[in-house]
């Protein structure tokens, strides 16, 4: 109920609540290791305009504030897709194939941010994992050492 209010009900302030829960739940990197870069799963611009905010970005930013870690919008959704929750399991992968790419505007700084670094891909809900897999492929191709997925809930 709270997650639906956050995702669809305009309750942006719940990002801090969910970030605190994630902070308590997830395993920290080994001492002395560079902290991971937090990267939100992006919304398509049309969905962002309709909703008025990007809940994954709000969540990633709030988690970054709790942990003192960097959050960067490195990915862009270049193709509108159906919500994964409404897609049949077999079509979820096809639904998000080639739907994401790295933001070109970041140029060389993108390589410096990602080169050999661990990334936590942040989203509100994990359905089949197809969206996370597609985003992870983009980040790994760009030089991330590893990508871990951090979500509030699984559907």
PLM features: residue spans?
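PRPP/pyrophosphate-binding module of the type I phosphoribosyltransferase fold
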Residues: 34, 70-155
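Extended interfacial segments that mediate partner engagement and assembly in macromolecular machines
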Residues: 1-66, 73, 82-89
């Amino acid at each position: 109920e709270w997650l639906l209010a956050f995702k669809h009900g305009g309750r942006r302030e719940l990002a801090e609540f969910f970030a605190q829960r994630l902070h308590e739940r997830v395993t920290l990197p080994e001492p002395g290791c560079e902290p991971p870069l937090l990267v939100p799963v992006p919304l398509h611009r049309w969905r962002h305009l309709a909703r008025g905010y990007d809940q994954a970005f709000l969540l990633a930013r709030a988690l970054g504030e709790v942990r003192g870690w960097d959050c960067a919008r490195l990915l862009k959704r270049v193709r509108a897709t159906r919500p994964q929750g409404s897609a049949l399991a077999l079509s979820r992968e096809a639904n998000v194939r080639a739907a994401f790419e790295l933001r070109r505007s970041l140029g060389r700084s993108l390589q410096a941010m990602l080169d050999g670094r661990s990334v936590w891909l942040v989203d509100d809900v994990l359905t089949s994992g197809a969206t996370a897999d597609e985003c992870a492929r983009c980040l790994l191709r760009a030089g991330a050492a590893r990508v871990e997925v951090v979500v509030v809930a699984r559907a």
